[in-house]
Amino acid sequence: GDEILSLGEPPREGAVYDSNRYTVFGLLTRLGVEVIDLGVVRDEPALLEAAFRDAAQRADAIITSGGVSVGEADHTRTMMKQLGDVAFWRIAMRPGRPMAVGRIASAGFQAKSASSPYAESASSYQNNTASAASGAVLFGLPGNPVAVMVTFLAFVRPALLRMMGCTRAAPPLLRAVSTEAIRKKPGRTEYQRGTVTTGPDGSLQVRTTGNQGSGVLSSMVQANGLIVLHHHQGNVAVGDAVDVMVFEGVI
């Protein structure tokens, strides 16, 4: 995006510093993958196309941040459709709703149609010779810092582990007792940042880290897990048991 500043650049009105690149780089490095950093791509379709074509030739997976919403300068999803296919876009979750997943075809391969096997089964991330030759899986993450971390942990990390041959790639969920009331409407999955502790009786307890805005980095810094409030769930009362995705040791 044109609004992205690299570290060391002077601040300017309407611009934000590039924090997501360093977050994703750290998460990927911890997984043990080889990272190819292509830097910041400006809001020009031609530049984005060139970057995607280059990345699809060099990598098994492409991860972007921003450009997947509905703004005039959000070209990522359009370019995904032009150069490959979109398996899904927009998820009933918070934070991270505008996430997109698809595939970018490499040179010499035609883009897949919406009825392709990949579009029909977005879980088929297992890497093999055929899929590697035909391009790269693309994860279009949101632009908000917390949404980037949540979507990486919930979607990207398990998918990459599958591509690496791991059979147990899904993050484990623990049960903990909520020590506070949490407001939640049914109809979407919410990942609230939380702190898990051990109660006097040895049971796991969890509380939120406060403001859950998708741009509030402090909510993630203070957390050691994500409180997973499932699609069907409503309000959580004090004493209710909830699922927690613990990421201490992951981040």
Q: Predicted segment positions?
A:
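Phosphate-binding glycine-rich loops and their immediate beta-loop-alpha structural context
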Residues: G1-T64
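Short glycine-rich anion-binding loops that position phosphate/pyrophosphate groups of nucleotides
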Residues: D2-E3, G67-V70, G143
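Thr-Gly-centered strand-to-loop micro-motif
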Residues: L7, L38, T64-G66, W89, ...
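Short acidic, glycine/serine/threonine-rich loops at helix termini
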Residues: L7-P11, L48-A50, D74-T76, R103, ...
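Residue-level "edge-of-site" marker
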Residues: V41, S69, M93
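Catalytic-core segments of thiol-dependent peptidases
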Residues: D60-S69, G84
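Short Gly/Thr/Asp-enriched flexible loops that form oxyanion-binding sites at enzyme active sites
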Residues: G71-L83
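Flexible glycine/proline-rich
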Residues: K81-K112, Y118-E120, S124-I251
